[in-house]
Structure formats: structure tokens, C-alpha cells
Amino acid sequence: SEYACASGMSFLSTDTKGDVMRNYGTIAKEHYGYQVSVIDLRNPTRSNGNNLLHLVNKYMDLYKENPKELVYKARCEKYAKIISKTIILSGMDAASFGQNAYFYDAAEGLLTATILLVAEFCEPEKRHIVSVFKIIQELLAPSQKKGKNQFQQLMELLPDDHKAKWFAGAALNTAEQSMASVM
């Protein structure tokens, strides 16, 4: 962190305990002029009002207004994928996943698909990461339909060419027990 501060570049630190924020946040702010923000995925009320889905929502809105401008849709999907990868990897190297790589890929796809659905279908005040996690939690509830988990049932409601289905690929073709590991 000290080297990043001294170089003046922007950076992101993962900080599960809050130590980096406590020890370096003040120094970065007071001595190097950094703007320090906290994004707390477990307790969003402790975050600095940063909506992780801002760019996804922005480009989804632009695409809805201009459906022929596929560049907006592509950017929306790109930012959804970046958010998913950032959350799933959380500072780890994907090469270290080994035998579990399938589950991480499926989780990333499921998260990307859910982010896109929230950006497309939720009311503006509900289009944030907390809604994404709430929906995923709700999808963990037992299914009434044998052989189909709730996520698969949700995806069945979408048109065949919907991009969320494409991102969710691996998660859609997994057994119910494996799906619990993905989620």
C-alpha cells in the first residue's frame, strides 16, 4: 500500500478485517491526498455510498433507450462481468482453483446473470448489489419442481436469446446439490 500511495496511482485493497483501512486509509488520505472509499459487501450501510452497479445500470438504461445501439448492451455486460469476477476472485488467482474451477466459473456466470437481471428488471432504487445478493439467497430456497432449482426456473422465464442465460450457462446445467456449492 505504501508503494501505491507514493506512486500516486489508483488502487483497490481487499480488507476483510478492516486493518488496511485503519492502518493505511488515514495515511493515504492525509499524507498523499487520496480519496478513500469503503465498499462493504456484507454490510452495505458501512459503505461510502458507492453503487457497484452504476455503470451496468447506466449502460442498461442507454441500451433500453436505444435498442439498436449494441455497444451499450456490450458495455453493460462487460461491467457486469468485471463486477462478478472481482467479487468471485477477491484477490485470488484463478489458476489456483484447480479442481474447483468449474464452481468458480459457474458462480461467476450466475452472479453476472443476476446482475444483468437486476439492472434490466428492478426498479431504479433497487438496482444495487444488495438486491443481487438477496435474489441469490432467495434462489437457494428449496424448489417445488423436482430436478430444477429455482435459478433454472427463473432462467426458463427469459427468452432463449437473453444474454443472462448465456452467462449462466454452467449454472443452468448443474445438479441441485452442485448448485448449492455454486451459490
What are the functions of these language-model segments?
Residues 2-109:
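Switch/coupling segment of Walker-type NTPase motor domains
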